Amino acid sequence: CVQHLLGDFAFAIWDNSAQKLFCARDHMGIKPFYYTLTDTLFAFASEIKGLLVLPIDRGGINEDRIADYLTCIATENESTFYNNILRLPPGHFLEINTGKSLLYKYWEPQPAQISGSSKFAYEEQFYSIFKEATRCRLRSNFPVGSFLSGGIDSSSIVCMSAGPLRHQLPDQMHTFSGIFNEISICDERQFFQSVLNRYEVIPHFICADRINPSVAYDRTIQLEDEPFWAPHIFMGWELMAIAKQQGIRILLDGHDGDSAVSHGLGLFPELLFQGKWFRLLKECYLIGNTPSLKRTLKNLFRVCWNCTLYRASALIPVTFQPNHFVKTLSRLNPSFEKRNSIRSRLLKAETDRPNDGQREYEHHMSVITQPLHPLALEVLERQCIQHGLIGCYPFFDKRLIEFCLALPAEQKRSNGFNRNIVRKSLQSILPNRIAERKSKTNFTPNMTHIFSTTGKAWLQFNVDKTPQQTYFYLNKEELFNIYDSFQREPSKTSLMDLGFLLRSISLSQWLTNQ
């Protein structure tokens, strides 16, 4: 039956006649499912802490998971930080009966059957699928809310909900946005204001560059049963708190619509391999907001280089080490690195990651099936639960994902615009300011600002009190070098460096509680 289900779910059903337990998790892993299985016991829970209270053997700490966490890769989505506690992977079901268990993948993305091949047929079908994916997530007896950032994903959701679907809402829609008065480079008011001007919604704002992140981080560390990934959780945390105050139960989120729809990067290799040089030059020229001959040639060289490397990698195993991996390895305790073959794990991750030399279908499949997706969704799920909210993600509807997988590359990227199908399909409801936006906001400047002002004392306290057991995994000297560099010039600190500091703190807190 699970093959016929839609939506977000994790459940277990006892089949008395067959004397077996049937467990399943939704397609993208939005709802979590953890379990432990021994010769004499099977136990499951929606949170790891539900298993930790049982008299079970946790199996010790999973050092491979720590290695992946500290090097910021995700190589699979079944293990946890405990050797004897597992995740039920997305799109899988598990059958348990006397003496045996069966883990089965019931779903992986498959291209949908699309009727018609004209751009108008594609646009009509996307509009219909996206409308339905949004509509079926609006069912509530309480006010419905949505994040609104000014990007095309959240804006599309708000415009569809407050526009064509407004009669499906139980009350006027609420939106939740961050504004940046001090770090203006992160401010998106010029974009999301066009949505607020067009639709009747109740907007709510926070000054995201004045937040003290310590509350969100300390509470999340308490909530999470593992070290967590999300570096920018504090803005979402504060917005969820406002949503709770407004009586919201359903909170819509455009989380990672990029992966669901695809930026269409596979168009470049396809044009190159097909010898369509004029179209390739045109698309290279139109990348970004300031086209130039120099930039065009640079983009063209990058396309040719990526395609050459990708073709070569099929014949020659990847053995080189990208600079960011070499830098990451230097931050680990050398003995930890050696006993867990971390270099090999990094090289495998480099081989398996989405490659810009892939054709569009391969690239899109590689992006949408990354193991990182359910890890991020699990953090969001617990954040929502803490605030009495149900997080809903229309772009992660399986019907929409499979439709986008089937689209030709030129429907995803055209004339310099990525996610072209969204822009064209929803042009009747999207403000031009949104539909014609090419840029994507980088929130790193606000991260460095926050942790050098309101969060400075919190960061210093937690780095200084890093427990000794953390250095079984980290290079202490490197940790403090990064921290000292951040203190001297926070604005020049990369997200990679600041993220490493925050992951170190999360790992330290988790190790202390073991």
Residue ranges and their predicted role:
Residues 61, 80, 121, 125, ...:
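Generic recognition of stable, solvent-exposed alpha-helical segments in well-folded globular domains
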Residues 53, 83-90, 100, 201, ...:
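Adenosyl-5′-phosphate
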Residues 1-225, 236, 428, 433, ...:
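Cysteine-centered catalytic environments shared across enzyme families
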Residues 34-37, 157-158, 261, 401-406, ...:
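Short hydrophobic alpha-helical segments that form membrane-spanning helices or hydrophobic packing faces
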